[in-house]
């Protein structure tokens, strides 16, 4: 599923695996910026589906933060 809550949780897990401190805050900030909404609204609209364009932007920002050679691809679902 590509709803807000699912992508938020996958993003947090990804950042934690990469050793990023404050992984939840970082993921919330990235997703809220991409979606153009306040962080609190991520939870109020947790069932909202994300477009492929939104997912691509989130992946790019996560990759920028982790600055890792192994990038998140469209196929590996943030894991």
Task: Please give the residue ranges for each predicted region.
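Non-catalytic accessory regions of SAM-dependent methyltransferases
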Residues: 1-50
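Conserved AdoMet
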Residues: 32-79
